[in-house]
UniProtKB/Swiss-Prot annotation:
Family: Belongs to the RRF family.
Keywords: Cytoplasm, Protein biosynthesis
An example molecular function term from Gene Ontology annotations: ribosomal large subunit binding
Pfam families: RRF
Protein name: Ribosome-recycling factor
Compartment list: Cytoplasm
Predominant location: cytoplasm
GO-annotated biological processes: cytoplasmic translational termination
Function noted in UniProt: Responsible for the release of ribosomes from messenger RNA at the termination of protein biosynthesis. May increase the efficiency of translation by recycling ribosomes from one round of translation to another.
Amino acid sequence: MINDIKKDAQERMTKSLEALGRNLAAIRTGRAHPSILDTVKVTAWGSEMPLNQVAAITVEDARTLKIVAHDKNLSAAIEKAILTSDLGLNPSSAGTTIRVPMPALTEETRKGYTKQASGVAEDAKVAVRNVRRDALADLKKLTKDKEISEDEERRAADEIQKLTDKFVAEVDAAFKAKEKDLMAV
């Protein structure tokens, strides 16, 4: 029972950390990276589709993404989707190939993105702490139902706290790495 609670808590905390990684990857740095366009949806064949399903996205150089549409008729729709996204990117089209240069980040935008990354990291910490709260509540219920002793509850609670501390430290490390990446000129 206790092991199930700890295992569930660890799995949920791991999922929170993975979500943090995806969310931080979506925050633009000065470098070109295909994950920047993960949020872009293209109207294709009568429905909204993620850009990576209708085109191949590659890194051409440090500051340019190259997009090749699977269907040449979608080039205009892809270009429009990138322009209308709130990423501040300005694609240029040449036949079926679309190039997306990454504009250099100003100090102000760097600080804004750092603040956004900080918020994402804080949300991840809250998620990890909510998992801890749920696990501790489950332990209390087991103690109340006399399925485990108070000593076992305390030991398990300490282990869950250590797990929480470990994941919060990983969240902090991920944020610090992203902050360093954002502030590098």
